[in-house]
Amino acid sequence: SNNNIIESPFYQRKEVVDRYNGLILNCGKEFELEFRAYDEGMAYRFISKYEGTYKIINEQADFRFDRDYRSHLAYAPRGGADGNDRFNSSFEEMYTETSLSGIAENQLIMTPTLIVGNEGKKLCIAESDVISYPGMFLTRTEDYSNVLSGTYASYPEKMAPRSWNDSFYKMENYADYIAKCDGVRTFPWRILCIADNDIELLSNDMVYRLASPSRIADTAWIKPGLATWDYWNNWEGQGESGKT
């Protein structure tokens, strides 16, 4: 069990209560599977114990539902195309409401994705602590109408300059794996946030709590003020700023 306070001076509240029950399953010499159960949901992640270099061919994350629930989701703008270009997105799409069976087959869905269950209870599929690893999209296949499966872009092997309005670099060649790793590490959290109503979703801190702690030891120099498109101006994918 864990019951700590996370200092969060730059979050929507000054402190966040981090209370959960945890379990780590030892799956042999090379990896572990960690679970955490919160009052507001649950999460799991893989932990690698392998000390050499290795590649992640794929990750299977299936979210299976017992019936055809309603969902609120956003399709990736190129999500119906073939190949890895379909993952190229500015993440600015509108959400739509549909049943699970009404989701377009093999169309990429962005996360977070919201499922409306019995008595209006909400279940939100999300992720956290995505470092040097592709973000998770979701897809529904024809054979499994009530199942949403994690889908990931392949690792980019070659990039070339491209116009500013899409990306500074275009991926020209992709590998047959999704990530390259070196040594012991943790992988992204797969999260299920649970709420009785929409209001509770707004105060759910699971994504924040499951993220890695700040790497900046001294934050006293950070002052309130205005910033201009820091996410845009640092996106060229080169150097340390493009590590993720």
Regions found by a protein language model. Give the residues of each.
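An acidic-aromatic substrate-binding cleft motif
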Residues: 165-167, 175-244
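N-terminal accessory beta-strand-rich subdomains and adjacent acidic, glycine-rich linkers
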Residues: 1-203
